[in-house]
Regions:
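Acceptor-binding helix/loop patch of EC 2.4 sugar-transfer enzymes
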Residues: 123-166, 234, 310, 315-317
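A short, active-site helix/loop in glycosyltransferases that binds the activated sugar's phosphate group
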Residues: 132-133, 161-202
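Conserved donor-binding/catalytic core segment of Leloir-type glycosyltransferases
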Residues: 203-239, 245-248
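Aromatic "clamp/platform" in nucleotide-sugar-dependent glycosyltransferases that forms part
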Residues: 286-287
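Short hydrophobic beta-strand element within catalytic cores of glycosyltransferases
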Residues: 304-309
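A charged, aromatic-enriched C-terminal amphipathic alpha-helix characteristic of glycosyltransferases
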Residues: 346-377
């Protein structure tokens, strides 16, 4: 089968490609590299010109005066120049409703070319989209990245990208995709729950994790327990990082001789991996039902991760033992759980083994790729 994967989000499509290739399928991945993370692709449409001093200044002026983004335009043009390579695929999968991330009119023009020149096209819900945002706004108690905004509307500027999914221009893109794709697949519980009952929703397939590359090792605790917090200022509020920071202030004072804290900010993917390889405990996010990609890779390596692990997640996978700590936007709760682990290192080792076994069973990249093939072939 010839498969085209368009867009990247936290290494998901890269891992899926690796699994599909293990099954002897021909796979092409094209993306912008997912911003500063610089994920690899067969065909990159990363904007470069706008990084130059003159064009960066011009971009800022145009954004401020006319809300026109030169970077989006460049991204679209670069994708257009690559479209000669994107023909006659058996399956195309788009990640999110804006996989190209150009201007809405240009996005639809490019997507129409993809639909007309290929066979089956599916949409993967692995991030914010119109259906997801609509659901969150109607269900404000739903654990989501928008909760900080609901509590403090002054944070709106940090959520502008979320609300672009509700503007009229994007809604046209949403309707086009919704009417023309063969189905919508969810990558985890956070995207499945808003899709329940939707006629286009065809199933949840867990994020693929390339366990062969990660080389999991038995966790060893020698002198100090190492806690890692990675900070990306672009999603600082959405991940609830401030709750972790406040908890760590207390933990650092209480257990000064028992712990080491690593805080890494805005690192490219490869550097981020090197830093967190040293840790026993990884602090990921507090506003989620399920694990995102960073959490899954850490769990595959046997880290104890504070992330989404709500009851809905445990019920879906029929878990009887904890594979991660369900993080909540509650500093006292986080302190309590961190303290318990620091004082009971045997529980760290036990959960480490549970996490590795869970990833092997539910997220192994080849098994997940097989599930995609089976689902695509139904349509």
């Amino acid at each position: 089968m010839r498969i085209l994967l368009i867009g990247e989000y936290s290494h998901l499509h890269n891992s899926l490609k690796e699994g599909l290739m293990q099954l002897n399928h021909e796979v092409i991945l094209t993306s912008s590299g997912d911003s500063f993370k610089n994920f690899p692709s067969d065909f990159l449409f990363t904007p470069h010109i706008c990084n130059r001093w003159f064009f960066a200044k011009m971009r800022n002026v145009l954004l401020r005066l006319f809300h026109f983004d030169l970077e989006e335009l460049e991204r679209g043009i670069r994708f257009y120049l690559l479209t000669k390579h994107f023909k006659n695929f058996d399956v195309v999968q788009l990640i999110n409703e804006k996989p190209i991330q150009t201007m809405p009119v240009f996005e639809r023009f490019l997507l129409k070319k993809i639909f007309t020149k290929n066979h089956k096209v599916f949409l993967l819900s692995a991030g914010v989209d119109k259906i997801n945002v609509d659901y969150i706004l109607k269900n404000k108690n739903f654990k989501s990245l928008l909760q900080p905004f609901f509590e403090d509307s002054s944070l709106k500027k940090h959520y502008n990208y979320v609300f672009t999914y509700l503007n009229k221009n994007h809604q046209k893109t949403h309707r086009f995709l919704y009417e023309n794709c063969l189905g919508i697949i969810a990558s985890d519980m956070d995207y499945m729950l808003p899709l329940r009952g939707n006629k286009k929703f065809i199933g949840l397939i867990p994020n693929p994790v390339n366990v062969d590359k990660l080389m999991a090792q038995d966790l060893k605790i020698n002198e100090k327990i190492i806690i890692f917090l990675g900070i990306n200022r672009g999603n600082y509020h959405q991940k609830g990082i401030r709750y972790f920071e406040k908890a760590l202030v207390f933990i650092k004072e209480k257990y000064v001789d028992k712990i080491e804290i690593i805080i890494a900010e805005n690192l490219p993917y490869q550097e981020y991996i090197v830093e967190y390889n040293r840790c026993h405990i990884l602090l990921d996010q507090v506003f989620a039902y399920d694990q995102g990609y960073n959490a899954l890779e850490a769990m595959a390596k046997g880290k104890v991760v504070f992330t989404g692990a709500e009851t809905e997640f445990e019920n879906h996978y029929q878990l009887t033992e904890k594979v991660a700590i369900n993080a909540k936007p509650d500093v006292c709760y986080l302190i309590e759980n961190l303290s318990f682990l620091i004082e009971n290192p045997a529980d760290i080792l036990k959960m480490s083994n549970n996490a590795k076994a869970f990833i092997q069973k539910e997220h192994h990249y080849v098994n997940v790729a097989s599930r995609y093939i089976a689902l695509w072939e139904k349509y």
